[in-house]
Amino acid sequence: MKISLTSARQLARDILAAQQVPADIADDVAEHLVESDRCGYISHGLSILPNYRTALDGHSVNPQGRAKCVLDQGTLMVFDGDGGFGQHVGKSVMQAAIERVRQHGHCIVTLRRSHHLGRMGHYGEMAAAAGFVLLSFTNVINRAPVVAPFGGRVARLTTNPLCFAGPMPNGRPPLVVDIATSAIAINKARVLAEKGEPAPEGSIIGADGNPTTDASTMFGEHPGALLPFGGHKGYALGVVAELLAGVLSGGGTIQPDNPRGGVATNNLFAVLLNPALDLGLDWQSAEVEAFVRYLHDTPPAPGVDRVQYPGEYEAANRAQASDTLNINPAIWRNLERLAQSLNVAVPTA
């Protein structure tokens, strides 16, 4: 199904508004979801709206929730998300952090009790657009674990994404590293299961602990587990994310004494800085440009057009989706059913 970006945003806004989400919050969520689809992250795009309906119906997300600063020490801020939509809460927190970097050159910010923050690269792009560098870790609580620790056969962690982003010179797209510490994100597994497509080898184990490519294994009565990317390396980063985001924010970790209500709650730890403070911008730009050209000059492997740096993939996808979105038929059917159940008009092609 091909629809315009305007229609896609309006559909998302209308679906959320029909569930008593305030207009400004619905706008932020809709914009974030559509941008995720444009970037090629369909697992964090419009396809997730049925999950948000479930969360709203179960009172697991606060439709009115807004970020509140509970500790302000100038270059250190702690926010509480009040269980609100992460795409709105996260945007508010990032805007506050960016303003502090403008004042002080750097900022550490934490956020607790946010509903699903969405695509973490979105916040990295916000920082990069302001000319700043971001490094963030996120943990996921209030749900059952879905990622097995290295050497384990059952889940003990969640997908705990990390993000690194910063501006690039000469009009190049920003550098954006946005990765789950699992081999694939849980929402990616959800999309694969919905589309009936196999998961990559080495990304999932079944309930018996054996490898499988059946993504639906993650959503059955006896679910399996995602594996950490890179074995012990991804596992270690997942543990770091759990402690930085879960403990330093005050939001908690996935350990079983904390609630597991069934709907993802995110905690965030982020560092932002102005890269122009220490060294001259001219030298920095020239050095980054030389490094990028060095990467681009790498002879490509068989079947590969060219080597890219992280962030170029998203930028190319966004350029291709400058006016319209191509939505998978199975995902579109789910959106149609959701809209019709809320008496929301469905756009036509």
From Swiss-Prot:
It is an enzyme of class 1 (oxidoreductase). GO terms for cellular component: cytoplasm. Keywords: Cytoplasm, NAD, Oxidoreductase. InterPro entries: Mal/L-sulf/L-lact_DH-like_ah (IPR043144), Mal/L-sulf/L-lact_DH-like_NADP (IPR043143), Mal/L-sulfo/L-lacto_DH-like_sf (IPR036111), Malate/L-lactate_DH-like (IPR003767). Pfam families: Ldh_2. It is found in: Cytoplasm. Residues 199-219 are annotated as: Disordered. Pathway: Fermentation; pyruvate fermentation to lactate; (S)-lactate from pyruvate: step 1/1. Its main location: cytoplasm. Its EC number is 1.1.1.27. The keyword Nucleotide-binding does not apply. One of its GO terms (molecular function) is L-lactate dehydrogenase activity. SUPFAM superfamilies: L-sulfolactate dehydrogenase-like. It catalyses: (S)-lactate + NAD(+) = pyruvate + NADH + H(+). Belongs to the LDH2/MDH2 oxidoreductase family. This is L-lactate dehydrogenase.
